[in-house]
Amino acid sequence: MNIHEYQAKALLKGYGAPVAEGVAILKVEEAAAAAKSLPGPLYVVKSQIHAGGRGKGKFKELSPEAKGGVRLAKSIEEVVAHAKEMLGNTLVTAQTGDAGKQVNRLYIEDGADIARELYCSILVDRSVGRVAFVVSTEGGMDIEAVAHDTPEKIQTIAIDPEAGVTAADVAAISKALQLDGAAAEDAKSLFPALYKAFNEKDMALLEVNPLIVMKDGHLRVLDAKMSFDGNALFRHDDVKTLRDETEEDAKEIEASKWDLAYVALDGNIGCMVNGAGLAMATMDIIKLYGKEPANFCDVGGGAGKEKVAAAFKIITADPKVEGILVNIFGGIMKCDVIAEGVIAAVKEVGLKVPLVVRLEGTNVELGKKILNESGLAITAADDLDDAAKKIVAAING
């Protein structure tokens, strides 16, 4: 689960991290009062969407010359003018895809005198099985380019889970970021605080980009991104209240209600599979034959007829889907249950695109019999390769 920047900063402020004063608004009419409540005279007006690259993004409804999703303002009047242009319009960034995301809220923040921009994130480094700091002196909007072009400028410092962030860890991170003076002193409290927040709130990612050194020498969290482990949300009612479902794919929200592992993708072949490994193999072979999967959908090992039907309806609700491939290896999951669920869903929502079903495992013959006797336009496949060829051929006509 992701949250907005202003929410992430409020959470970090509770852990003692240095953040600027700011106010989130939902309406243009709130912009002037929000700006007046801040010290000024420099303000930053930030689009709040769950995507990076906002500063370099462009609004669909505005001219190409218009400014992006993060703007400086030197007066309250300029803050209001920016709010009028940004709220309600669609921001397209490198991470949103061509569709973009509608900006429904802004964060108006006090400006900062920036001396240096740094990068700092915390994540689980699976290569060593520990939480790690990933840092670079090259922070700001182009961190992706740094990672691609000059990866040697990014350093990783793994943390011993028993010891936590030690003085030696702080020194190593500070050295990697070339901190000295007041910034190095601030680091002694900031990095342990970030680590504590990451662990206590069961985050999957905590990214501060940029972490700035101000002209007075002190550190400040200028932007913050947080992603939480969805499997741990039951422990964090305070975090769950921060969820903004308008920023999420409606199909993924519906899937979560049925405990389905569903991720929307950009392709045109819908996939329904049991087991994450088989799901990834199915997506791979679709790509091998020249098409792209429209989703990752794992119905799990113990799904019943209703859950299978729900998964099928979610897949068919995607207007990009031009064909559907159901690939089931029945172990705990029985092939006849899959067949009954697919048929129930098809009868309810109709079938306007080609459907290929490959079944193998427990009750496979019964499952095939149910499909064959359904009278529906369902194409059977003998194996995964055959299934992929058939669904691609059906789409290509």
UniProtKB/Swiss-Prot annotation:
PROSITE patterns: ATP_GRASP, SUCCINYL_COA_LIG_3. Its EC number is 6.2.1.5. Belongs to the succinate/malate CoA ligase beta subunit family. Heterotetramer of two alpha and two beta subunits. The gene is sucC. Keywords: ATP-binding, Ligase, Magnesium, Metal-binding, Nucleotide-binding, Tricarboxylic acid cycle. The keyword DNA-binding does not apply. This is Succinate--CoA ligase [ADP-forming] subunit beta. Its cofactor is Mg(2+). The keyword Nucleus does not apply. ATP binds at residues 46, 53-55, 109, 112, 117. Residues 9-254 form the ATP-grasp domain. It comes from Rhizobium leguminosarum bv. trifolii (strain WSM2304).
